[in-house]
Amino acid sequence: MGKPGLMMTPGTGWEEDYHLGANFAVIPWEYSLFGDFSEQNTTQFYSVRAGFSSFMEVNLSIAHRPKMADRIGVGDRQIDFRFRLLEEKKYQPALVIGLSVPGSTSPVMHHDYLVLSKGFKTRYGFLKANLGYGSPLVVRKLSGKDNFFNSLHLDRKEDIRSGNYLNGLFGGLSYMPVSFGGLMLEYDTRTWNMGGFLKIKNRFYAHIFNFEASSSWGISFSAQFPLDLKPKSLRDAKHNN
């Protein structure tokens, strides 16, 4: 859903060398946050991520629904912040908190969460486990109110359209038997999903994933870029001085 992570769940991944990222994903209508039987509209997610420090990132996501473009335009937009509270160490998991900016009258893409992860090297490859908790509450903007702060209202996620997604405990596993790809399994509090991914030099990623062992598939592509355009060797030398 435009957030760094596995397939449909956020993770703790943090790109130290590539502070700018772009992502494109296609989610089938029956598993998108907006899908219902009357709409049947595949959702396209576009997102841009920017890291401003070693502990903070901002993410802009757009959910575009092609069949409704003439009525709603580009689509729903959401700004999220990620904060790295703990960096992974030998005996310490990584810990990240994600917060969505409130203010939407239809907060389908509003998700606050806490997630931790730990990686394990094995003789058969690299295994990483994620465990997180999605807030059951969202802040919604009531229409017809002139004052922004007076218009904010706290709702239960189950009362809005995306109610079962990232509502409570979620988690997942990724397994890399080789350096250029691997397999994924996750539970997003709504569905079980599984898939695979390929990567090229930590810069380009391609994912394909399946929902609930059904005929519905999603895909995503992402790319990472350094804000400092100097060669990596020069950037490393600068950090070491």
Regions found by a protein language model. Give the residues of each.
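Predominantly the C-terminal beta-signal and adjacent terminal strand-loop region
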Residues: W192-L234
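Transmembrane beta-barrel domains of Gram-negative outer membranes and organellar outer membranes
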Residues: M1-H111, S117-L127, S135-R140, F149-K157, ...
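Outer-membrane beta-barrel transmembrane domain signature
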Residues: F37-Q40, Y113, S117-N193, K199, ...
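Residue-level recognition of beta-strand termini and adjacent short loop/turns
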Residues: S53, E57, M176-V178, K201
